[in-house]
Amino acid sequence: MDQELMDFFDFSKEFVRKQAPRGHVSSNVHAFVTESEELEKPIKREIVGKDYVKSFVEKEKERMNGIFSSDEMAPMRNKSLDDMDSDEEYEASPEIRTDAEFYEKYYFNLNRDKSLPIYAKREEIINAINENPVVIVKGETGCGKTTQVPQYILDEGFKSKQYCNIVVTQPRRIAAISIANRVCQERQWQRGTVCGYQVGLHRQLERFADTRLLYCTTGVLLNILVNNKTLTHYTHIVLDEVHERGQEMDFLLIVIRRLLATNSRHVKVILMSATINPRELSDYFANERSAPPVIDASYGRNFTVEKYYRDQLQTINWEGHQEDINSPGITQEGYRSAIKTILVIDNMERNERSTGKSYNQSLREGSILIFLPGVGEINNMSDMLKDMANHDSIMKFNMVRCHSLMSSDDQREIFQPSPPGYRKIIMATNVAESSITVPDVSYIIDFCLEKVLFTDTFTNFSSLRLVWASKTNCRQRAGRVGRLRNGRVYRMVTKSFYQRELSEYSVPEMLRSPLQNCVLKAKELKMGTPVEMLALALSPPNLSDICNTILLLKEVGALFPTVDGTYDPCDGDITYWGTIMSKLPLDTRLSRLIILGYIFNLLDEAIIIAAGLTVRGIFVDSTRLGSDNYWMHYVFADGSGSDLVGIWRVYLTYLNMCENGLQKDASIQWAKRFHLSLRALSEMNLLVLDLRLRCEKLSLLPLNFPISRISDDSEKAIMLKVIIAGSFYPNYFVQSKSTSGDDRNMFSVISGLDPCRTVYFTSFTDRTMGELYTRKVKQLFPETQIPPENMDVTFGQGSEKIFVTFKNDIYKPEGTTYVHVPGRIKAEVYKALRLRTYCNHHSLRVMEPMSALKYVKDKKIGKVVEGRWIPPSKPVAVELLALPSVFDKIIVGRITNIVSCGKFFFQPESFENCIANMSEHFNNPQQLQNCVRNAGAITKGLMLLAKRQGKYQRATVVRVDTQNSSNVRFYVRFVDYGDIERLPMTQLRLMSQDLLRHYRDLPPRLFECRLALVQPASMVSTYNAWPQKADDMLHALAKGGRVQLEIYSLVQNVAAVMIHLREGNLNELLVKEKLARRTNEDYMSRVDHDFRMRKQECRGYVSQQERQQVNEEYLRSKQLPQDMDLSPPPPQECKSLIILKGPFSTLESTVFSTMQSGMSKTVRIDPCSVNFVLLDTEPQDQHAKMVVAASISSAGRHNDVLTLRSTSIMPNIPGFAAIMTLIFCPRAQLNANTANSRYVSILAGLGYHPQTMKSYYEDHDLVINLDVNIDEHDVLLINQIRYMMDSVFFNLEGELRPIAGHADRVLIHDTIYRALNRLLSKNRNFIVCNPKSSDYVWQDMEESGEPDPQPYGRRSIFPMHTIPELHEENMDTVLDLIANCKEMYDYRNFEGSFDPMTCRLCKQYLESVSELRLHLLTQLHLDREKEVGYPMD
């Protein structure tokens, strides 16, 4: 690499500052609860239509007029392009090329199938092809045109021994393959010789030189023509199924017409379709001398098809309003009318005698196909049919669904005959229009509706719109009957509406879908600007759509912002990235994913994810199935919180299964178990292989390091999410908490229980004596498969809530798989909340209050005091608890067992004598005589003696290990040490009654601990677990003997502690070693810490007796409500019904868009996403967390609801959103606070026009507010990464390949990895989030000085960011802040009336002393104190 460019990032040299504007902040108003009316207003957009088309079309007509007239064309045949010697030969009449040797080599049978309708037009077709450059053939499905017309051409070549090379396009891969195989079978040719196929890069061409008839997909031919820029490799080009008007087909027509008019005038083009608009196509290819002839090969049907409309169905009284062309949809009355139609059909067949068929025979042959627009409508129709079945027992039917997301088993069910006595009713979307033919369908009910995907090119948000179907669609649907017998079609609209209002043809894909790939093809073709090329389309798009597409391509790095150095809003020079994207059969963002995968050396992972996002239906549709189906998303996501990671893991599992040679039946069972589609996975596998081959051809190969630069799975997971964030910029969303302000409400709603383990129901009645129904509440979770013994059910005192807390039991029932979920939250919480999506109302039968009171009195359950029931409870002797006293700050003792830094057990040295005495008592030979002889005597929860380190200690049985029945072992937990061991019966002893009397109720002589104020660093943490190195440091400390703990807080009997070292403490050391990062303690912990500090400050003024009393009250308050698991009353006594709502969680959260186009919209997550149940996975952490969506769709009346699809929760690394934005955005503006002492927000986008100061792409401008410190050195590191990413594919103008070689790539990868690691592992100070009203305003970045140097100039995809200079905070301001801080500490122990005040360091309004105390404990305030130099105790 150029040394001068490398010196640009040499940190040993002086950092020269460049002046830049001191811009002010913009912010995501929703994410930080800031109101701004301006942001709620929609962006004003100027839509430019099709006036631009006229001039380009006229020029093209002049070219078309140069095509030779028919008498000139008659004797001509093509040379191959390779035979041409000069451009002049294009204008000359080419010599006739013979191919006699080829024709002698293969057997040619000239007897064609005369029974096919197309045969009658054979001579007419051949003559038309010989006499015209373009011929249009219209023929119904089944007439034989696809297989026969190319053979007719080839047969003519055989007769005259003239050279033929025919290519035939098909819109679908499977069609190209099956038709080629059928032709080979018919002609008795070996596959891949005379006739073959090519789909993607997959070819069946055994002898490529001999192939004269090639069937391929539309995209394959388009790529060939774009690369060759001529048609002359072929003599005949046959475009089949032209009516489908896919985007590739429309652009292929542009290319063919242009090449016909320039350098390929002697190639023959044949356009074929069943429902073609011949006049439109004929006009498109016409010149001033002639127009292409249209040959109609339609034929009459052998069976009649009767069509009926809504107003013709006299026996059905259709009530309600008339159809509205502007309001497509199905009313309840519409569904009911369809049901009535079905009943009429059934009744008609019961009474029909003239056909001579029995009713059972009519049932077999009389299946009904109902065309519905989508899966939601299929579900509604299904529900209506079920209701009908419940009320009408005469008619029996078998319901079958048919849509694109079906599993293979469901697809097969469509073709299976219904059981005897049952009528088959198929409910289908438009997938059944042409792809599927079911032989036994005799009736069609058509609502004349469909759902079509439209994309708003301004925002790039897609929406699935419900529209009226075209007449062409309706005719295709009607064509599903009348093939084997007479049929009937019932259209659920009036005849006049059908004839007058429905359009003849559907909206072409080019007018409703993204145009990125077409624009890239136009740039690769180099025959005009994208605007010029797309103006020549059969249906040209709006100019504004083309310009918006150009902006999108500039955003993803496919185009440079300029053309020959000049900015053009409707054009841009193609980048090497764009060249790669044009070669990949993917959406441009997925191609960007592969490019970034190559740069970050995660190429194969990127290919797999891109393929998985392209192929639909990998997971069987889970919206109507149980929670077990949805839970499989979690199984494969494996705690990543990413649908994309889930796709990657699904594929790896599938690949492993294939490599192990799993039998077909076993594969089907595997797919059923995990609710996967083998068909979709097989298609995905083909695409993965295709993409790998394409990448290899593009020289995109992974680096094979001797030792991987990524040290472990956690770092790989981070890097994978980095490229996901980079690929799908700017689809960035900020996760917001359900509780605003502090996290107090999070705990108050659930009465102080652990929100990471607790869900709750509402609408319960406090007078109902809820403790009687705990077992019934536990039975509300059948679909979740959560064992009742893993739940504690408690009730809010005086509230209408029921709390369900899931136990921290690390041992799962046998046969279950442990599933990782993001963060600290229990998997059962996700399962319970997902239950609400299927049913949010749960019935609970209870007794009447007076009957219940009598019941508990009679059964002597608890006590009744003054008419109020007090449930039974287990008494706790708080004076015997080993928990730390409220007055103790420092405790010395031993760490007896370590699970991790987040869970270990501590034994205070004050209990050493007690432990020694107990051990001596337990190990008395007399006590060890009670050997266990019967394994059945040992049950879960039993207290006994178990052997530990050579001595017996008291333990409780956790569970029985039944894996080995001959040698039963038991998992036991040592009560006074905290560890769990798996022991045989020989190492267990039953406790005598004397021992049980003394020690059964004695609390453990230890307490559980976790490290305070720190959490695992995401860069080294998998599943939010503490890294092994951190645990090893704690183990080493424990082995040293006595340990000194500083108690921070005690919450739910778990102490948050700091472990003192000779210098500092372990908590700080872990942060320094980057194994942990600083974090806030949650609200309950801060409350307890504040209470403990105040009690400890007055310890010297309180007597020993009073201290003991206060501590007992303190410990008693720490005990949680108990679930006594009472037996419920008899069902016959429970006569009242309560409808519970829920379950809910206080951790539920929503997301808000950072993009301007999404600011005023409601944002939801796709129900099929692993993040549909979105929770705050680190509730104590106040940092903004980012969610990235692979795609976004809009819905709602005004498209004001966004649905995020294929989402990924980004790592919980402070500043991650800001860092990703700065690395991957095209251009950014760093905004400083008013004092210019720190950066407070980032405005990112395509930039602005230097004269007008207007944003180039306002819709996609986004703002990230900073809640942690990002400094100048961080931006310099980011610039280094951007420069290195540019270096990978940088090529000089005119060069075809990048200049970076393999050695350069290794250097680049190492530099990127090191810089990124430094950025993401840096411990950052918290800063005040500082939103202002001047959002999304670009400042002149050059008015205050020279811009930063750009190493690659205008050929840079990632230009360097300007780094505004920061200043030290004004000393007077600092002194004011220190005074304000001192004032707050003076108020800390204030007991009188308090006037609300503001913490000026944090800009936090404080209404009470208690709020002030807790605020002083937040990490934000502590960091700000350190920043201003306030002396802290």
Curated annotation (Swiss-Prot):
Residues 126-294 form the Helicase ATP-binding domain. Residues 355-526 form the Helicase C-terminal domain. The keyword Ribonucleoprotein does not apply. A motif (DEAH box) lies at residues 240-243. CDD domains: SF2_C_RHA (cd18791). It is found in: Cytoplasm. It catalyses: ATP + H2O = ADP + phosphate + H(+). Keywords: ATP-binding, Cytoplasm, Developmental protein, Differentiation, Helicase, Hydrolase, Meiosis, Nucleotide-binding, Oogenesis, RNA-mediated gene silencing, Spermatogenesis. Residues 935-998 form the Tudor domain. One of its GO terms (cellular component) is cytoplasm. It comes from the Eukaryota. One of its GO terms (molecular function) is ATP hydrolysis activity. The keyword Signal does not apply. GO terms for biological process: meiotic cell cycle; oogenesis; regulatory ncRNA-mediated gene silencing; spermatogenesis. ATP binds at G139, E140, T141, G142, C143, G144, K145, T146. Its EC number is 3.6.4.13. Belongs to the DEAD box helicase family. DEAH subfamily. Probable ATP-binding RNA helicase which plays a central role during spermatogenesis and oogenesis by repressing transposable elements and preventing their mobilization, which is essential for the germline integrity. Acts via the piRNA metabolic process, which mediates the repression of transposable elements during meiosis by forming complexes composed of piRNAs and Piwi and govern the methylation and subsequent repression of transposons. Involved in the repression of LTR retrotransposon copia. This is Probable ATP-dependent RNA helicase spindle-E. It comes from Drosophila pseudoobscura pseudoobscura. The lineage of its organism: Eukaryota, Metazoa, Ecdysozoa, Arthropoda, Hexapoda.
